[in-house]
A protein has these predicted regions:
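Aromatic "clamp/platform" in nucleotide-sugar-dependent glycosyltransferases that forms part
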Residues: 184
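Conserved acidic donor-binding segment of nucleotide-sugar-dependent glycosyltransferases
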Residues: 215-226, 233-239
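Donor nucleotide-sugar binding/catalytic pocket of nucleotide-sugar-dependent glycosyltransferases
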Residues: 66-98
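Nucleotide-activated donor-binding/catalytic signature segment of Leloir-type glycosyltransferases, i.e.
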Residues: 146-164
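Short alpha-helical donor nucleotide-sugar binding micro-motif in glycosyltransferases
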Residues: 21, 163-164, 171-176
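Short hydrophobic beta-strand element within catalytic cores of glycosyltransferases
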Residues: 201-204
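Conserved donor-binding/catalytic core segment of Leloir-type glycosyltransferases
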Residues: 98-117, 123-130, 134
Length: 274
């Protein structure tokens, strides 16, 4: 079934969706994000159960309380939501193929070039690190980040690469010695799961689901540039000595799509029983 994108306040769009759902007659409608959750909450008159997924950290979470159950990709995204909820994390992409071993060329960071991603902290933390860093992404902070790179005389070892599609990331993973997550806040960094599945070490701030994967002493305090710099300076240039093999195996088994489907189905079953 398909329906055109509709606005939160579109009377005609909501009516089309209402008619479509009446024809389908679902037991459960599962929405993702605040927009679709708002729309379904406004048209549902108790004809079906409503599950809402939260993927990022939101200031206003009240709309999610109009559903019957909330799924969050990490603890912090559902904190403060006062209805039944459960953490079901993101997963690594099932189409990923394992990488061949070989000499690695650079450290890698991936994400939108926005303040929340902490790339300014990452750049400031790179002064004493010898390894090359590639940041993949685009966004409104690009010019500020380029200026920061130049101000610190780091252009010879930090590059920003734009225009990389998701299916092209594997080319960069292949030559990466480590993936770095520098976010100030985050719902659940999927790139970290992909890297760990591909047996690429990860260094991260304590955001999203990362505390389910790493002990606290292997995570930098979020929104703390000094803590991030300390973690990176201790590990990046000698990353080959950091053994994360047990974490690679844990992520492959516990963050696969099959396991997450089972967890979501358990939520559905509990709603239908009740």
């Amino acid at each position: 079934y398909k329906i055109k994108n509709i606005g939160r306040r579109s009377f005609f769009g909501k009516n089309r969706l209402k008619i479509l759902l009446r024809d389908i007659s679902p037991d459960i409608v599962h929405t993702h994000g605040s927009k679709t959750t708002t729309i379904i909450a406004s048209i549902n008159k108790g004809n079906y159960k409503h599950v809402a997924s939260v993927h990022g950290v939101k200031k206003n979470k009240k709309i999610y309380e109009k559903s019957n159950f909330v799924i969050g990709v990490s603890k912090n995204v559902i904190n403060g939501i006062n209805i039944d909820s459960k953490v079901i994390t993101n997963w690594w992409h099932p189409n990923l193929s394992k990488l061949p071993s070989g000499k690695k060329k650079y450290a890698l960071a991936i994400g939108r070039l926005e303040k929340v991603k902490g790339f300014d902290y990452l750049i400031e933390s790179w002064r004493n690190i010898e390894s090359e860093l590639i940041i993949i992404g685009s966004g409104k902070e690009k010019l500020n980040l380029l200026n920061l790179i130049n101000q610190n005389n780091l252009s010879y070892k930090i590059k920003i690469v734009e225009g990389v599609k998701k299916n092209e990331l594997i080319k960069f993973y292949k030559d990466a010695s480590v993936l770095i997550v520098s976010s100030r806040d985050e719902g659940g960094p999927r790139v970290a799961l992909e890297a760990l599945y591909l047996k690429i070490p990860v260094l991260s701030t304590n955001v999203g689901h990362m505390d389910l994967i790493f002990p606290n002493d292997m995570l930098a305090e979020r929104d703390n540039q000094i803590a991030l710099q300390s973690l990176l300076e201790s590990n990046v240039d000698n990353i080959e000595t950091l053994n994360q093999s047990a974490i690679f195996e844990f992520v492959e088994n516990e963050f696969c799509i099959g396991k997450k489907i089972s967890e979501i189905n358990e939520v559905y079953d509990s709603l239908l029983v009740n």
